[in-house]
Regions:
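Solvent-exposed interaction patches of small proteins and small membrane subunits
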Residues: 1-142
Length: 142
């Protein structure tokens, strides 16, 4: 578990660093950059919920996931205090699922706006909290 947790935390750190660069990029004028942002978001979200599951199973000993789905992991993570805002995480999950079916530019731009306005910060805060949990960093300020 420690190796998986540590590896996922390192991946999350790298991905969050890349997402943090989005405001400096031509996201809304370059389709390639837009698509890259949305792809990075999907990967970052997936690494995050899998990191939650690693902690729930490895540290908290919770192994009775009927499905092990992201929705279930988010709910159990909120209950156990790993995340504060399960509604935002469920919104991110919905967006992640919808991205596979977005084919028009306007919908992609709306998705990118949500990522840039809300989800980049939420993912970065989650990473900081997990870094602190692992003893790698200082806690974020509310």
């Amino acid at each position: 578990m420690a190796l998986s947790y540590s590896r996922r935390l390192d991946q999350l750190h790298r991905l969050n660093g890349e997402l943090a660069e989005a405001p400096d990029k031509p996201v809304f004028t370059d389709g390639y950059v837009l698509s890259g942002l949305l792809s990075k978001f999907k990967i970052c979200f997936d690494v995050s919920w899998k990191l939650m599951k690693d902690i729930l199973v490895g540290e908290l000993g919770i192994v009775d996931f009927p499905k092990g789905s992201p929705r279930e992991v988010i709910a159990i993570s909120a209950y156990n205090g790993l995340i504060d805002d399960d509604e935002m995480w469920l919104e991110m999950l919905r967006l992640r699922n919808e991205l596979s079916h977005i084919y028009d530019g306007d919908a992609a731009e709306r998705a990118a706006r949500a990522v840039m306005d809300h989800y980049i910060v939420a993912l970065a805060n989650f990473e900081k909290d997990m870094q602190t949990r692992e003893g790698r960093g200082t806690p974020r300020r509310p």
